[in-house]
A protein has these predicted regions:
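Active-site environment of divalent metal-dependent phosphoester hydrolases
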Residues: 6, 36, 190
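Central helical "cap/lid" subdomain
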Residues: 15-79
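Conserved flavin/dinucleotide-binding core of flavoenzymes
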Residues: 10-12, 61, 77-226
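Residue-level marker for beta-strand->alpha-helix junctions and adjacent short loops that shape enzyme
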Residues: 5, 32-33, 148
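A conserved short coil-to-beta-strand element within the FAD-binding core of flavoproteins
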Residues: 1-12
């Protein structure tokens, strides 16, 4: 359970204390994070590395907020619990309560640029403005700034995102003779950045690897990692 530090052209994977020889390597990190955090094989095409470094991380510039309540009062008051806002700080809000209303929660997303000492007050004021006084007094207000997370925020967080790079054809073609696979949600052609995109990428990758296994029984001479 260690972060990968280096992957060689021969598909030897180095962590802090160990090394593994693999038949296949799957990069499940967002491409920009992989390029930033891992010394990748030197033989990778320069264009692929450039595209990977510029591909946005879906949550890399986001703040997630969850407001918890004793009951989903907005339902009994005739509100859907869903809202969009250009004023903010939350650009979108959704009802995250269970089917029976427990736990009773609203959640939303804001841009990381909104993070400052007074963001909690700003959020409470927005909830009051949109759903009434009870919304502005949650039992608990949870705020997660993903832009400060090492394995979520890429170095390019904050610049104009190039969403057109999601699902780029380079990601769908395994490199190093079909043995190095890009498999994060950002590599999907549909629903990139979402769970559905991650499932698409996983299906594409597993099909590529299992197809190779059908014609080869080779196992790793060092560790059995495939």
């Amino acid at each position: 359970d260690q972060p990968v530090q280096r992957i060689t052209d021969e598909l030897t994977v180095f962590t802090t204390t160990d090394e593994w020889r693999a038949n296949h390597v799957v990069i499940a990190l967002p491409p920009a994070l992989a390029v930033h955090a891992i010394e990748l094989p030197k033989s990778l095409p320069n264009e692929l590395v450039d595209i990977a470094s510029r591909t946005p991380v879906w949550m890399g510039d986001s703040v997630k907020v969850v407001a918890c309540y004793s009951e989903p009062f907005w339902r009994t008051e005739g509100f859907a619990g869903a809202a969009m806002s250009r004023r903010g700080p939350l650009a979108e809000i959704h009802d995250m309560s269970g089917p029976a209303g427990e736990p009773a929660t609203l959640f939303g997303f804001a841009r990381a640029a909104w993070m400052h000492a007074g963001i909690e007050t700003d959020i409470r004021e927005q909830l009051t403005r949109m759903f009434g006084p009870r919304a502005g007094a949650p039992i608990e207000l949870l705020i997660q700034d993903w832009s400060q997370e090492k394995w979520t925020a890429a170095p390019n967080t904050g610049r104009s995102p190039e969403y057109g790079l999601f699902g780029d054809p380079y990601y769908r073609q395994p490199t190093l003779d079909g043995r190095l696979h890009w498999s994060s949600t950002e590599t999907a052609q549909a629903f990139a950045g979402h769970i559905e995109g991650a499932l698409e990428a996983a299906e594409r990758t597993s099909t590529a690897i299992l197809g190779d296994r059908l014609t080869s029984t080779e196992t790793s001479p060092r560790s059995g990692l495939n």
